[in-house]
Structure formats: C-alpha cells, structure tokens
C-alpha cells in the first residue's frame, strides 16, 4: 500500500493538464478584460471624433443660423452629424455606436467672444472684421457606455463624455 501512494505522488503524468486547468480561468479573464478595455477606448475615440466633426460642421454654417446665446437653426442636422456621421439621416442609417440611440445625449450651445482688442484693434480679422461678437459653438456628448459584459447582464454604469468647440466662420 505504501508503494502505491509513493508512486502516486511522484507520477508526473497529467500535471500539465492540471496546471492548465488552474491557470485557464485567469488567462480567460485577462483576455476578456483586454478586449473590454480595447472596446472602451474604441468607443471613446468614436465619440471624440463625432463631436469634433459636429463642431466643424456647425462652424461652417452661416452666422445667421448661429445666434449668440440662442439655438442653432440646424441643431438637428448637427446632432445627426455627431451620431450618424451625416447631416441628413434616412431610416436605414445606423448610429456610429450601435447603442447610441438617444439624440438627447448630444447638446449644442452657442456663445460669443467680444471682438474688441487693445486700442480699437480687432482680435479677429477676415470674416470677423465687421462683427462685434464672434460666435463659438460647443458640441458635447454624454453617451451611456454599453460594455461587452452586458450580454451577461453586467453593466458598468460608465459614460463616454466628449466636447469640442469651433469658432463659426459662416461659409
């Protein structure tokens, strides 16, 4: 009987399989976490690019459509550029992020710079020379993040936030 036990403790067959069974859950967790982190950074980058494109689109609208302290005339189109990547959206268009379904997550605000400099000189020249106030548009998005683990019922409760500003030059 003693010989059988000693043989069992010194037998190395199957030890690699046992070690793999112990380490596999850790490796799978690390791989899933890496995928999740990559998806988070990708989605954050998509939101950053979207608000930047929305601010650029808004900056190219006419001065009349961007009243200081008011609401942009084409606010719906600006929000469409942010969420869909295009100003006019059809029924078959999909948002840049498949879970970005709420247009209220995008805000467009307009404020103005006073275009008065030192000794009567203007701060801004060119298209702004005759203007006393220069409109600046800010596009902000606050998107609730949907992680990969949401298919298992887990939700991290994270929000992707981005903001971009551009001075309106009314082309």
What does each of the following model-derived ranges do?
Residues 1-13:
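N-terminal leader/signal peptides at the extreme start of proteins
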Residues 2-3, 44, 49-171:
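Short, conserved structural patches
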Residues 12-15, 28, 76, 158:
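Alpha-helical membrane and juxtamembrane elements of multi-pass inner-membrane transport
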Residues 16-36:
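Alpha-helical hydrophobic helix detector
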Residues 24, 39, 48:
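A cross-family signal for key residues in well-ordered alpha-helices
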């Amino acid at each position: 009987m003693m010989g059988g036990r000693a043989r069992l403790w010194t037998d190395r067959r199957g030890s690699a399989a046992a070690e793999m069974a112990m380490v596999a859950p850790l490796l799978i967790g690390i791989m899933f976490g890496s995928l999740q982190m990559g998806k988070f950074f990708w989605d954050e980058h998509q939101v950053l690019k979207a608000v930047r494109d929305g601010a650029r689109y808004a900056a190219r609208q006419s001065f009349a459509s961007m009243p200081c302290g008011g609401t942009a005339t084409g606010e719906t189109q600006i929000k469409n550029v942010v969420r869909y990547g295009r100003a006019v959206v059809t029924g078959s268009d999909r948002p840049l992020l498949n879970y970005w379904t709420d247009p209220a997550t995008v805000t467009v605000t307009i404020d103005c710079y006073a275009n008065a400099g030192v000794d009567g000189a203007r701060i801004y020249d060119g298209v702004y020379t005759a203007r006393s106030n220069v409109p600046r548009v800010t596009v902000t998005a606050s998107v609730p993040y949907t992680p990969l683990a949401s298919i298992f019922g887990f939700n991290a409760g994270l929000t992707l936030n981005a903001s971009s500003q551009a001075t309106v030059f009314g082309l």
